[in-house]
Curated annotation (Swiss-Prot):
GO terms for biological process: translation. This is Large ribosomal subunit protein bL32. It comes from Acinetobacter baylyi (strain ATCC 33305 / BD413 / ADP1). InterPro entries: Ribosomal_bL32, Ribosomal_bL32_bact, Ribosomal_zn-bd. The gene is rpmF. Belongs to the bacterial ribosomal protein bL32 family. The keyword GTP-binding does not apply. GO terms for molecular function: structural constituent of ribosome. It comes from the Bacteria. Residues 7-16 have a biased composition (Basic residues). SUPFAM superfamilies: Zn-binding ribosomal proteins (SSF57829). GO terms for cellular component: large ribosomal subunit. It holds the Pfam family Ribosomal_L32p.
Amino acid sequence: MAVQQNRKSRSRRDMRRSHDALTENALTVDQTTGETHRRHHVTKDGIYRGRQLFAKAADAE
């Protein structure tokens, strides 16, 4: 079992944890379709930076 060499203070512990906070996804609105999507990601329609990268797949139902 691991045993600490020296006790860490609350300050040191909290400084280590300062990078553990979660951030919200950055969202943006597509200028052509008005759809909200994550930045630097392709929309559901297959559009990225104003270009159609692939056709939307038809539903399999």
